Amino acid sequence: MYRRFFLILMSYILCTDICAQDVPQVTVFLPNPPKAESDLFICDNYLYTYGKELRTSDRGTQAKIDMVWSLDDYMPLYADVMGITVSAFKASNIYQLLSYGDRYGQLAIKAAVMSYNRERPYVYFNEPSLLPELDELHSDESSYPAYQSCLGWLYALLLAEVCPDIMNDILKRGEAFGPSAVISGFSFDSDAYAGYLLGSAILSRLHTHSGFDDLLAYAQADYKRLTKASTRFDDTPYFSYEELPNSVIYLPEPPAAGSAKYTYDLAKYEEGKSLRRTRSGIRAIEDVEYSTDNFCRIYSEVLGVTINATVTPAIYELVSRVHPLGNAATQMAKGHYMRKRPYVEMNEETSYRPDEAGLRETGSYPSGHASGSWLMALVFSEVARTQQDALLARAYTFGQGRVITGYHWQTDVDYGRLVGSAVYAVLHTDKEFVSQMARAVNEYKSLYSAIHTVKDEPQETEAPIYTLQGVRLSAPPTRHGIYIKGKKKINIR
């Protein structure tokens, strides 16, 4: 009883100053909602129409159930997957972790939707939603990014850290909130996707909050006690291929030929080709190499510090051990679906020929590069929290480069980022990763402090100037004569 009270009190104390903490700024790392008549807007419209057709089906019934707006309403939906009840009085430590994430998530969503003014689909088309009794209540709210997919995915990522033994089922449940928001008419598909990415950004920011790791540890202990499950929070270093989240289970199938998303993929492929001779096209080729050193180069430019094995050994080791997991976690779906890559499907050249032969017979969906870059941006965001928005923006650009070069369809890239989010979450169930992250954070803090100390030191040109009598001048001398600047005599004529 006392521990429960302490956890509740600690959670609220941690959140008392939460408004003063920065929330992820979606305007920095996400594109704006699609403009009318754009390819993505047309895709959104088709999917809205298709969603309406599903409202009388079993999937429509599920969508209606999924349209919830509070943590207490989300929890029964996850309880069906977890096999335990989560509330303030049952599995209370898990509930407090989610409650803390929910309060911060609500702030982040509020800040995000205030940046946009996109009408909800049912408002735009002047039609009733699947839940007409809620239409008036939510009609003035922006639909971008989608509330349900953001919080639903955030809860799924948090629970994947708590319950790694059932992570695939949890992630599958979390992903389903996006399509439900589309079917209900409350969100467009692009709103739902933006919500997923915001949810992953929120998780990364939560891991920088003081006391959050304690809440997570208590929640993990709660789950193990209640279920007797053998969790992954042990001393085995990181993950084997078999232990990674299974992308076949929690991702939707790649778009079928002739579908709205496939048509959108074709349009984005043509758009990508038109960008190959631009700066974006050049950068896409620079980003092709999937390696520790290339990721360090890319994110060093964002952070403004050099990241390599000599200057930052702890961060370098973190990158070298994490980045392979981003690509590895996509291989299950790649092998299962064996979707043809764009240059193979279209029988055309890419903008980077050396990799064509080696990748021709490999699956395109989802993108390993997009997964790895988003994963590394989330990891770097935990190391350097003040740079999160810029890091995620760079990762988003990295993923788009795969469309420009012709190695991936847009939907490959989109869902690759979700894979990276899932891997980032479950990494926090590994003690060695958590320890390595702590070393990397401390190393970055020391390096950042040293850099700023050097920058703040007066340079020789800024040395104080004195008269020969020892009087320090508050401004450069205007009279002729001999003065002392630093350790040198200067003659003002």
Question: What do the PLM-derived regions correspond to, one by one?
Answer:
Residues 4-14:
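Sec-dependent N-terminal signal peptides
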Residues 15-20:
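Sec/Tat signal peptide C-region and signal peptidase I cleavage site
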Residues 21-184, 205-215, 221-405, 418, ...:
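Hydrophobic alpha-helical bundle signature of multipass membrane enzymes
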Residues 187-194, 406-417:
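Short acidic/histidine-rich active-site segments
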Residues 200-202, 421:
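Catalytic phosphate/nucleotide-handling subdomain of diverse soluble enzymes
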Residues 448-469:
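Residue-level detector of functionally pivotal "anchor" positions at catalytic/ligand-binding pockets or at interdomain
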Residues 482-493:
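C-terminal tail/sorting-segment detector
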